[in-house]
């Protein structure tokens, strides 16, 4: 219930100490202002990270090996080792809640680049060995043709999917890309698809258009990798936190 006497008392108290009233009001205003700024910055950071991830599934992680931190059975500390094909199968078999486990390899290691030849033109690009489900983990737009499929995996087909940046640098304007051949470290690959990355990571966005994807099994065979796995892209089921 409205009480005139109470409001008069409040107004008199505020008028009696105008400086304290001003400082208190400023403190309340400043606190609200900072809260709004922090909430806005938090949302902006979240949106920025999502854009920079370039469509990468939010329930996907990457796993790779590092040097050992302890000696083991007479072997020294600091040893380097690799995942192998059986490790991939073990994860699929023994770990519940995984939707995709995609082994990956890259020529030259992390951020490695290798000469790719098309006729008289040469370029340095990242070349990846992948499984078909990788396009579900890091989506990309297929502009022409197709992505890698399990027929390619089973038959070790020498096929590749290339980015728009590769076409701009190695092909003449208007030249037919699908069905052409491109040479990677001396091995000929048939171009079966053209992709466009949806990455928004600044300068990396341009580099993400300059990649080649080939079947994982073909990669291991063509480049003498044996059963080595560089790293894995692992996607959990929707109801499983990672």
Segments predicted by a language model, with ranges:
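Alpha-helical transmembrane segments
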Residues: 33-69
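Short acidic/polar micro-motifs at solvent-exposed secondary-structure junctions
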Residues: 66-83, 89, 102-133, 147-160, ...
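Short secondary-structure junctions
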Residues: 93-100
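N-terminal Sec/SRP start-transfer signal
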Residues: 1-32
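Short amphipathic alpha-helical segments
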Residues: 59, 123, 228-232
């Amino acid at each position: 219930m409205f009480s005139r006497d109470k409001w008069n008392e409040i107004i008199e108290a505020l008028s009696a100490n105008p400086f304290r009233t001003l400082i208190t009001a400023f403190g309340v205003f400043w606190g609200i202002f900072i809260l709004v700024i922090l909430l806005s910055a938090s949302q902006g950071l979240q949106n920025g990270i999502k854009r920079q991830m370039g469509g990468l599934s939010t329930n996907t992680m990457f796993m790779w090996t590092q040097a050992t931190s302890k000696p083991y059975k007479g072997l020294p500390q600091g040893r380097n080792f690799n995942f192998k094909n059986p490790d991939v199968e073990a994860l699929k078999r023994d770990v519940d809640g995984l939707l995709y486990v995609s082994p990956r390899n890259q020529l030259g290691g992390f951020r490695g680049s290798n000469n790719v030849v098309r006729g008289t033109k040469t370029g340095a690009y990242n070349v990846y060995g992948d499984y078909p489900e990788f396009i579900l983990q890091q989506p990309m737009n297929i502009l022409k043709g197709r992505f890698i499929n399990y027929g390619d995996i089973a038959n070790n087909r020498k096929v590749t999917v290339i980015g728009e940046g590769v076409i701009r640098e190695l092909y003449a304007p208007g030249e037919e890309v699908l069905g052409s051949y491109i040479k990677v470290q001396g091995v000929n690959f048939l171009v079966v698809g053209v992709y466009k990355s949806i990455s928004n990571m600044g300068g990396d966005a341009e580099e993400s258009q300059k990649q080649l994807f080939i079947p994982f099994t073909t990669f291991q065979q063509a480049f003498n990798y044996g059963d080595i796995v560089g790293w894995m892209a692992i996607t959990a089921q929707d109801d499983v936190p990672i």
